[in-house]
Amino acid sequence: MLLKLAGIGKLFGARAVLRNVSFEVHPGTVTLLVGANGAGKTTLLKIMAGLARPTVGTVERFCEDGGLGYLGHATFIYPGLTALENLAFWSGMHGNPTDKATLSEALARVELAPFAEERAGTFSRGMAQRLNLARILLQSPP
C-alpha cells in the first residue's frame, strides 16, 4: 500500500468540504477523483500530498518523502525555455536527474518527445500540463 486515508474531514470555518473520506492507494494503480466544482477534490489532493492537514481523520503514507506528487490547476513553466530546458531546470532545482536521456524519457512518457526542443511558450495548455506532469515523474514516484 502507498497511501491510506481514514475518516478524512476538512472544515473551512463552518463549511465542511470533506466528510468521512476513506480509501487506500496501492502501487501501480491509478486513482481517479471525480466531482463537481467545489466538491473538495483539490483539498483532498493537497491533504494526500501533505500540503494541507485534515480537520479530522488520518493519512498514512508508506513511501519516502517526495514519493507523492501534486500537480495543481495553475502551474508554471518558463515560456522562453525548451521543454528539455524546463525539465532540466526544475529537476536540478529539486536534486533530481538532469541528464538528457532521463529528461527525454520523461517527455516520452507524457507524449512530448517530438517537442523536446520547442519553446514551452508555444505549447497548448494541455501540453504545458503534460510538461509539468513530466516534472513530477522525474521525482521517481513509487
Question: How should these model regions be labeled?
Answer:
Residues A49:
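Helix-to-loop junction immediately C-terminal to a conserved catalytic motif
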Residues V34-A36:
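The feature captures the beta-strand-to-loop junction immediately N-terminal to the Walker
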Residues R53-G67:
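Conserved ABC transporter NBD signature motif
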Residues A88, G92, T98-F115:
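Conserved ABC ATPase "signature" region
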Residues L133:
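Hydrophobic anchor residue at the start of the ABC signature
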